[in-house]
């Protein structure tokens, strides 16, 4: 009787304990589901707030510092036609005869207004001029020497280490001689303009005889559809037969423009031949190294990629109790 009473009390305590555990589990699951339902809402609110702050910051920045304006074809200028320049090909170089003709066009036409302040006389040797021609050309100009004992600066003939002289003493003199417009330096003009050689060639050959109907040209400007705004201070400078080439090449407008553009491209990038040679060497070496790396990878990892793994679990012996039961039954 006492044993039954103890057993009943134990069952009652166990059932109460299970009920309490289930209630606690149910309440915990309810809380977790509520938290899970609230967490996406909080994340969405936080994401929306962060997006609003970022968009507001960008809008405020552009309100303070940004400037947006519509661009018309007349304001932007016509896009230059793409021309097949030979020196832009991978395995081609400059035409040295064209460089010599282009330098002649620059000296006789462009040098009166535009400078080449980054090109020394020594860079012309072996590419455009001989050593004697470059020395004679340098000696035609005078350069300042170092101050002497009395502090006076004297003049000396130019040397190969000197740079091509500027046509004006300073920017103010250049603006005064060109109605307020400052002629740009042509040392890097090909690299500094969108379109490069195509743009410079189109600009030099794009002057019409008369502005088209409806085109407005400001005072002191010339119409050129390739220049942004179509109004340029530089007038047309290339005409047929303007230059007498030494090699007898007909000096048409397009020929002179082509030669001077190729010369200006060389002036902006005289190391183009070295760069192309270095690029070819890099491509050859990297190709060989890549082929070797592929071979070594396949050779080293072939055994790992071709191996087969078979799962063979160990077989466990039958339990000893199963073997002993028949013997016990036989004895009984």
Swiss-Prot record:
Domain Cytochrome c: 97-250
Gene3D superfamilies: Cytochrome c-like domain, Cytochrome c1, transmembrane anchor, C-terminal
Entry's Gene Ontology BP terms: mitochondrial electron transport, ubiquinol to cytochrome c
Transit peptide: 1-70
Acidic residues: compositionally biased ranges: 139-151
Any Pfam family hit: Cytochrom_C1
Binding residues annotated for heme c, in chain numbering: 110, 113-114, 234
Entry cofactors: heme c
Enzyme Commission code: 7.1.1.8
Chief location category: mitochondrion
Record's GO cellular component terms: mitochondrial inner membrane; respiratory chain complex III
Enzyme class (EC, first level): translocase
Topological domain ranges for the Mitochondrial intermembrane compartment: 71-277
SUPFAM superfamilies on file: Cytochrome c, Cytochrome c1 subunit of cytochrome bc1 complex (Ubiquinol-cytochrome c reductase), transmembrane anchor
Protein's cellular compartments: Mitochondrion inner membrane
GO MF term list: heme binding; metal ion binding; ubiquinol-cytochrome-c reductase activity
Co-factor note (free text): Binds 1 heme c group covalently per subunit.
Transmembrane regions: 278-296
InterPro entries: Cyt_c-like_dom, Cyt_c-like_dom_sf, Cyt_c1, Cyt_c1_TM_anchor_C
Catalytic activities: a quinol + 2 Fe(III)-[cytochrome c](out) = a quinone + 2 Fe(II)-[cytochrome c](out) + 2 H(+)(out)
Record family assignment: Belongs to the cytochrome c family.
Assembly information from the UniProt record: Component of the ubiquinol-cytochrome c oxidoreductase (cytochrome b-c1 complex, complex III, CIII), a multisubunit enzyme composed of 10 subunits. The complex is composed of 3 respiratory subunits cytochrome b (cob), cytochrome c1 (cyt-1) and Rieske protein (fes-1), 2 core protein subunits pep and ucr-1, and 5 low-molecular weight protein subunits qcr6, qcr7, qcr8, qcr9 and probably NCU16844/qcr10.
PANTHER family for this protein: CYTOCHROME C1, CYTOCHROME C1, HEME PROTEIN, MITOCHONDRIAL
Physiological role: Component of the ubiquinol-cytochrome c oxidoreductase, a multisubunit transmembrane complex that is part of the mitochondrial electron transport chain which drives oxidative phosphorylation.
The protein's name: Cytochrome c1, heme protein, mitochondrial
Organism, as annotated: Neurospora crassa (strain ATCC 24698 / 74-OR23-1A / CBS 708.71 / DSM 1257 / FGSC 987)
């Amino acid at each position: 009787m006492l044993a039954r009473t103890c057993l009943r009390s134990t069952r009652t305590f166990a059932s109460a304990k299970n009920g309490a555990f289930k209630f606690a589990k149910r309440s915990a699951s309810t809380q977790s589901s509520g938290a899970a339902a609230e967490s996406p809402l909080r994340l969405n609110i936080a994401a929306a707030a962060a997006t609003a702050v970022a968009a507001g910051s960008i809008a405020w920045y552009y309100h303070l510092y940004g400037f947006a304006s519509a661009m018309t074809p007349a304001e932007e200028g016509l896009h230059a036609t793409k021309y097949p320049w030979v020196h832009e090909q991978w395995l081609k170089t400059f035409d040295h005869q064209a460089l010599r003709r282009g330098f002649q066009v620059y000296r006789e036409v462009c040098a009166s207004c535009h400078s080449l302040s980054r090109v020394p006389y020594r860079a012309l040797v072996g590419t455009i001029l001989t050593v004697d021609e470059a020395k004679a050309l340098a000696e035609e100009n005078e350069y300042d020497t170092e101050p002497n004992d009395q502090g006076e600066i004297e003049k000396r003939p130019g040397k190969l280490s000197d740079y091509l002289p500027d046509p004006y003493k300073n920017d103010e003199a250049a603006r005064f001689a060109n109605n307020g417009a400052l002629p740009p330096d042509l040392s890097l003009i090909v690299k500094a303009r969108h379109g490069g050689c195509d743009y410079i060639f189109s600009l030099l050959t794009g002057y019409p005889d008369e502005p088209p109907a409806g085109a407005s040209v400001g005072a002191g400007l010339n119409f050129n559809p390739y220049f942004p705004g179509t109004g340029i201070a530089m007038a047309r400078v290339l005409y047929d037969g303007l230059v007498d080439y030494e090699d007898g090449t007909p000096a048409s407008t397009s020929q002179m423009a082509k030669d001077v553009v190729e010369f200006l491209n060389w002036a902006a990038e005289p190391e183009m031949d070295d760069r192309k040679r270095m690029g070819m060497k890099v491509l050859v070496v990297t190709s060989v190294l890549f082929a070797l790396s592929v071979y070594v990878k396949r050779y080293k990892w072939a055994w790992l990629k071709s191996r087969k793994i078979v799962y063979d679990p160990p077989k466990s012996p039958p339990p000893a109790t199963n073997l002993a039961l028949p013997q016990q039954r036989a004895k009984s």
